Curated annotation (Swiss-Prot):
Coiled coil: none annotated. One of its GO terms (cellular component) is cytoplasm. This is Tryptophan synthase beta chain. It is an enzyme of class 4 (lyase).
Length: 396
């Protein structure tokens, strides 16, 4: 039986209760078989094209970098059906679940984007769907909760712990431990126990593949850097995967600095965490001196995660990718700048990557550089949050 690597350097692995090991082994084998089956690939690609709307556009920002010699392109995952990159890998995993003969799907969600993507895939493919969501996030993201319910999903609020994403993750895994014979756990990011980080990367890698083809067609060369926000890290690894071997291309991930890296209110475990075991994997983790998981914080619910995918941890450790951090305020500024100058309202998550790109352009205005930002999602879900913040600041 062929096996995928369970580790990326020292990170990754499969730290789960023994009861889940057979389910993960079955999933790994089903994924390997599916990848070698042209019918599976064909069905997946057809859904991506005809249902989700791939390939997504690569848009040159005409106004954003005026006064500098930077050319900035956006990879428009915000245009995907469902409103974010999440739809890509959810369709892949839902097809995989059907292939394994499972008709129930369990998912966790923070901002609600993964929950919405899971609900739409289940509606399309005739699967039962239950989504665990921190009770705080249920309040913060009511439009997405209603969207999930409209598409037939059961949304289960989680009140334990901090009532946010990490608690929803724990509840979803607990559910799967009892139901894995009939249910598939559709994990929402490139993290968690092996083989999930690899599966999610492979079902997201078309982001980078398309970007490479599109930028070569437009500019005749590869970009100097590709930039993506990092929570768990699926949109970033989808963008990075096809560029890892291209040494001339910088890979830049952007973590949420929240209210400041020097405060305890951020979500930047890669640069400011310690290695630990969480959510079935060994990875950098926000923890206190006793090893207890600390609360992460970000204005964007989708980046509010106390750990990070193991491949990002490895790319950081070997120096192949670099990881910066952007505060809430910097992300909000980028959100407003893109809306006012290009007529595109980005997700707050994606605004972190955009803010970093704008800082690069402004730091060296005379430098000719070609940058691509993965605009991982659209900002419809965030307009009420942004409205309230701007009102509080007296800006509206």
């Amino acid at each position: 039986m062929a096996k995928l690597d369970a580790y990326f350097g020292e990170y990754g692995g499969q730290y789960v209760p023994q009861i889940l090991v057979p389910a993960l082994e079955q999933l790994e084998q089903a994924f390997i078989d599916a990848q070698e089956d042209p019918d599976f690939r064909s069905e997946f690609m057809t859904l991506l094209q005809e249902y989700a709307g791939r390939p997504t556009a690569l848009t040159l920002c005409r106004n954003l970098t005026k006064g500098t010699k930077t050319k900035l392109y956006l990879k428009r995952e915000d245009l995907l059906h469902g409103g974010a990159h999440k739809t890509n890998q959810v369709l892949g995993q839902a097809l995989l679940a059907k292939r394994m003969g499972k008709d129930e799907i369990i998912a966790e969600t923070g901002a609600g984007q993964h929950g919405v993507a899971t609900a739409l895939a289940c509606a399309l493919l005739g699967l039962k769907c239950r989504v665990y969501m921190g009770a705080k996030d249920v309040e913060r993201q009511s439009p997405n909760v209603f969207r999930m319910k409209l598409m037939g999903a059961e949304v289960i609020p989680v009140h334990s712990g901090s009532a946010t994403l990490k608690d929803a993750c724990n509840e979803a895994l607990r559910d799967w431990s009892a139901t894995y014979e009939t249910a598939h756990y559709l994990l929402g990011t490139a993290a968690g126990p092996h083989p999930f980080p690899t599966i999610v990367r492979e079902f997201q890698r078309m982001i980078g593949e398309e970007t490479k083809m599109q930028i070569l067609a437009r500019e005749g060369r590869l970009p100097d850097a590709v930039i993506a926000c990092v929570g768990g890290g699926s949109n970033a690894i989808g963008m990075f995967a096809d560029f890892i071997e291209e040494e001339s291309v910088k890979l830049i991930g952007v973590e949420p600095a929240g209210k400041g890296i020097d405060t305890d209110q951020h979500g930047a475990p890669l640069k400011h965490g310690k290695t630990g075991i969480f959510f079935g994997m060994k990875a950098p983790l926000m923890q206190d001196e006793h090893g207890q998981i600390e609360e992460s914080y970000s204005v964007s619910a989708g980046l509010d995660f106390p750990s990070v995918g193991p491949q990002h941890a490895h790319l950081n450790a070997i120096g192949r990718a670099e990881y910066g951090a952007v505060t809430d305020d910097e992300a909000l500024d980028a959100f407003k700048i893109l809306a006012r100058n290009e007529g595109i309202i980005p997700a707050l998550e994606s605004s972190h990557a955009l803010a970093y790109a704008l800082q690069l352009a402004q730091a060296e205005p005379e430098k000719e550089q070609l940058l691509v930002v993965n605009l991982s999602g659209r900002g419809d879900k965030d307009i009420f949050t942004v409205h309230d913040i701007l009102k509080e600041k007296g800006e509206i």
